Amino acid sequence: MDVLTVSPVRTRAQRTAFVECEYALRREDRCWTPPLRRDQYRLLDRAHNAFLSFGEIELYLAHRGREVVGRIAAVYDPRFNHHHGARDGFFGLFACVDDQDAARMLFRAAGAWLAERSMTSLVGPVNFSMNYECGTLIDRFDEPAALLMPWNPPSDPKLIENCGFTAVQDLHAWEWECTPGPPALLDRAAAAAAARRGDITIRSVDLSRYEAEMDRVRELYHHAWQDNWGFVPMTDHEFRQLALRLRPVLRPELSLIAEVDGEPVAFSLTLPNLAPALRMAGGRLHRWGVPLGLARMLRESRKVRQGRLMAVGVVEEHRQSGVVPLLLARTADAAHRLGYEALEISWVLGNNKPAFRTLRSLGCRRTKTYRIYRCDLLDLLDPGDPGTGLADRPCDTT
């Protein structure tokens, strides 16, 4: 059998191999949505990824002989650790063949790099914080993921768990069928809230003042999510970069702000689920100088019949005011008018029991679970752990 090695990414060719690794390993999986290669290169570029203005990443490739069999990114996020008083390192962009030795070597390489920065645990997957794509799919592998949600083969959770990782948090996706008019319970709750608080108004995001509107959403997001597990505030640069990324797919009727006496107190953001259109592009907008992928994506986007409700946030002092039913009722009505058959609500923290009760009362059903794992670095880097020969060195850097 060919020798298994893990090495850090240093050259342009290695960076290309790192990006292409996921496409090579998952191209036969019909449920995988190939991200645009342009976006994947930008994710690793300090000029295009605001996270890298304060965070650090180290990329690793696993080879068996000359064949790339896996990859991982070690992620150091000083803002997260300052916010939580922790010493957590992270891993992301994990992709690996079903090879336990390769996975173990990748995790040990990432862990060793983070240990050099005084981190004590390895948490993930996150790309590169909880504000972005995160979690390992642990069920429903036969269904494609929604827009901006991850997908992985069934082997991934096994590879992670067999390296000593344990679950630290689950993130759930729920499905909400779109029907003519909001569900009766939601309709009654929204009507009661409107009667009780006549000063609540729900409006669409004004795209002509997009930057100012996104600044309002950012403030609401930070206030509403500040006590959530894993939350870390986004910098102004990060949020504006995300807002620019979302702008081309934003539908104003599904992007809502709730105000009380003219002051924003809540928001909800629902996007068309363009994952099927992205699959048609195959990871490239252009081939041989011709916009074939773009044309296929635009054609498929006209057939979209699902959306993803990706965020709802309410400032604490208005959580009992009935503003959430008003936002959801407006969203349900707009989604039905757009011809949507269902919305995926994702993700919802596994410890958010009040949200579970609300979703069940609306007739939603839980569809997918994404898991965040954690491992102590002392256990991961234990010299007595068999299998990879990394007892004397963090990784083979040849």
Model features per residue range: what roles?
Residues L4, P150-G230:
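Acyltransferase donor/substrate-recognition loop-hinge adjacent to the catalytic core
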Residues L4-S53:
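Hydrophobic alpha-helical membrane-insertion signals
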Residues R26-R46, Q226-L242, P272, G282-G283:
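Conserved GNAT-fold acetyl-CoA-binding loop/helix
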Residues L36-M149, V249, E259-A277, L298-V304, ...:
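Conserved donor-binding loop and adjoining core beta-sheet/short helix segment
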Residues H82-G164, Q169, L285-S361:
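Acyl-donor binding region in acyl/amide transferases
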Residues W174-A190, R371-T398:
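C-terminal "cap" of GNAT-fold acetyltransferases
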Residues R218-P272:
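Phosphate-binding active sites in nucleotide-utilizing proteins
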Residues P233, E259-V260, S268-L274, A311-E316, ...:
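Active-site proximal loops enriched in glycine and acidic residues that flank catalytic Cys/His/Asp
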